[in-house]
């Protein structure tokens, strides 16, 4: 009978030990998941701040003067305004995409307070597309060979729309939405 009690006691102790180990492991996994979630949130906030700083830097240093024969009226999801600017056709369509990024700068951020250096280690994702109104054609971001794209813009009368890509974050901080609940696409 004593041996049976010892065996039952040992089995209960083993079950308790297994249960405690499982509880510890579950708590460790929950803690790691919570820490990973907090880190992802911090990283996202940091990326948003860097993007805002880059936009202001781009407005001051990368955006060409509004001159040239191609008049563009660009609408962005953040507002329904037609933002008009003139461009010179060239091999790159990058100025158009930089312009679209700078349209999301809040009016409270004046140009004289724009930074002289871009955020360290930040490369803009350009997670939006620019399309012509009619016929609907996507304007490609090209570093070279963009002359055809500028011709397409000119044929469309310069009426363009910018819209967020499927998994993009473009404009989220400005609109205050971190989910894609309201479809921002036009």
What residue ranges belong to the model's regions?
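Ubiquitin-system adaptor modules
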Residues: 1-186
């Amino acid at each position: 009978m004593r041996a049976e009690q010892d065996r039952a006691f040992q089995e209960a102790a083993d079950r308790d030990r297994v249960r405690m180990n499982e509880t510890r492991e579950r708590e460790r996994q929950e803690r790691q998941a919570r820490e990973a979630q907090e880190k992802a949130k911090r990283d996202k906030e940091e990326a948003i701040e860097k993007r805002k700083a880059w936009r202001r830097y781009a407005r001051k240093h990368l955006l060409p003067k509004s001159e040239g024969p191609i008049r563009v009226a660009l609408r962005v999801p953040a507002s329904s305004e037609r933002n008009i600017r003139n461009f010179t056709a060239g091999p790159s369509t990058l100025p158009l995409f930089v312009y679209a990024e700078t349209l999301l700068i809040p009016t409270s951020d004046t140009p004289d307070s724009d930074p002289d250096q871009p955020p360290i280690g930040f490369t803009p994702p350009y997670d939006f597309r620019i399309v012509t109104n009619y016929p609907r054609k996507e304007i490609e971001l090209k570093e070279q060979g963009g002359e055809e794209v500028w011709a397409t813009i000119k044929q469309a009368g310069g009426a363009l729309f910018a819209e967020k890509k499927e998994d993009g974050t473009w404009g989220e901080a400005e609109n205050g939405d971190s989910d894609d609940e309201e479809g921002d696409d036009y």
